[in-house]
Design a protein with these regions (language model features):
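Nucleotide-activated donor-binding/catalytic signature segment of Leloir-type glycosyltransferases, i.e.
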Residues: 267, 275-303
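Membrane-proximal helix-turn-helix segments that form the acceptor-binding/catalytic region
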Residues: 119-122, 126-130, 143, 155-175
Length: 416
């Protein structure tokens, strides 16, 4: 990877994700890397553990270029189910050695770390700090505000996040955060001009239609119900923080007005709230016949589901998690040009207006969410008009090339 002509540095993005398939974190780093490259700056993904699409047997594709993005996996030391072990720590150390070697060989690198658990990733942080390699932690949520850790592993991880919260503002070159709330939070720990707000990113290419094989079960389900029912889509963890209990109650209210509706859900419930528990609640509410769980689906399948949805939901609860973060899926939803109901949390109202580009409901309020659902289906042509406005506004304020350019300028300023 040679140094770009437009700037005199390369950007190494470090994140422990399933690449190129994966969930929100994979989408984050992929679109950022693409945006950086589109701005004529070299970028590379460095990924500790796992392997291409999680296939640990195929070591021949652990380094290469995927959709213009150079990537390199560090998985010499095998691990189990992507969990923290001594071997995964050794993989992290290998990345630290790689960064140090590049610096010794004359590469002028800037490091962005998406994985900010200090216990697990401190070799990378300390290598950058001791060798004066600029590095920018990238935070998309206030991790220490997460719900109380239950397992030993999650308690250890929470300790790592707390250490990062204390140490990284003191030793990093700057911070990249997803919301103004997070900027305000970290401004108590470091100068404001060293904090860049980089919100969700969108790519207009994501609005292009996705096709699945005819024998794909997801496609068969969607095709058999499209135009017969209102397909209302929720994707997430099914937890309180994502407002799922309120969505269920709101959906039940909607069925009195628009009975030919199906709540289509995807995602991975937590082990503390398994799908069996969710289905039990759905059954008790009397909406089981209008509920469909499709499981944890692939990214192209998720895009297909979203593009064929009649309504998409992002109804987070009013919590520290929601207010300091920004739902990445909102950007993906906006690219579908389909109506969206979100709740009034965090920075959403800063960018999108209710009844103009999106439908906004009160958080933790099933009645408010239900009223918005009814509004959408009572005048669906108007709802589609609002959704198209949302698409255009997203391209204006979240475009990945423009926002990546702003981030590059922020980095350049903080290298002076």
């Amino acid at each position: 990877m040679e140094t770009s002509q437009s700037v005199n540095f390369n950007i190494l993005i470090i994140s422990d994700v399933d690449f190129p398939e994966g969930m929100a974190a994979t989408a984050h780093i992929t679109i950022l890397a693409k945006g950086i490259i589109k701005n004529s700056v070299n970028a590379m993904l460095l990924i500790p553990s796992s392997s291409f699409n999680g296939d640990t047997e195929k070591y021949d594709i652990n380094e290469g270029i995927h959709e213009e993005i150079p990537y390199k996996f560090f998985n010499k030391h095998g691990i189990v189910n992507n969990k923290f072990t001594f071997n995964s720590y050794r993989n992290v150390k290998d990345i630290a050695k790689y960064i140090k070697k590049r610096e010794k060989n004359g590469f002028n690198d800037v490091v962005i770390t998406y994985c900010n658990d200090f216990l697990k990733y401190h070799p990378i942080f300390l290598t950058c700090y001791s060798h004066k390699i600029p590095f920018f932690p990238w935070e998309v949520e206030k991790r220490i505000s997460s719900s109380e850790a239950k397992s030993f592993r999650s308690k250890l991880q929470m300790l790592g996040f707390r250490l990062s919260d204390i140490i990284l503002p003191k030793i990093s070159t700057g911070f990249i955060v997803i919301s103004t709330y997070l900027k305000q939070y970290y401004s108590n720990k470091m100068p404001q001009d060293k904090i860049c707000v980089s919100p969700i990113l969108v790519n207009s290419d994501d609005s292009l239609s996705v096709q699945l094989q005819e024998n794909n079960k997801i496609k068969q389900f969607i095709d058999s119900n499209k135009n017969k029912f209102n397909l209302i889509v929720y994707s997430g963890s099914f937890g309180e923080k994502d407002g799922f209990p309120y969505i269920l109650d709101a959906f039940k209210k909607l069925l009195f007005h628009h009975p030919k509706s199906i709540l289509v859900t995807t995602g991975k419930p937590s082990k503390y709230n398994p799908i069996e528990n969710i289905l039990k609640i759905v059954n008790e509410l009397g909406i089981i016949d209008n509920f469909k769980y499709l499981g944890l689906v692939k990214r192209d399948e998720l895009k297909f589901i979203n593009q064929n949805a009649d309504l998409l939901l992002v109804c987070r609860s009013n919590s520290e998690f929601a207010n300091h973060g920004f739902p990445w899926k909102l950007g993906e939803y906006l690219m579908t040009k389909n109506p969206i109901i979100a709740t009034k949390v965090g920075d959403i109202e800063t960018y999108l207006q209710d009844n103009k580009e999106i439908f906004l409901a009160e958080p933790e309020n099933a009645e408010s969410i239900a009223n918005k659902m009814i509004q959408v289906f009572d005048d669906y042509d108007k709802a589609k008009e609002i959704a198209n406005n949302g698409y255009l506004k997203a391209l204006e304020v979240f475009d990945y090339v423009k926002k990546s350019k702003e981030l590059i300028e922020f980095i350049k300023i903080n290298l002076k």
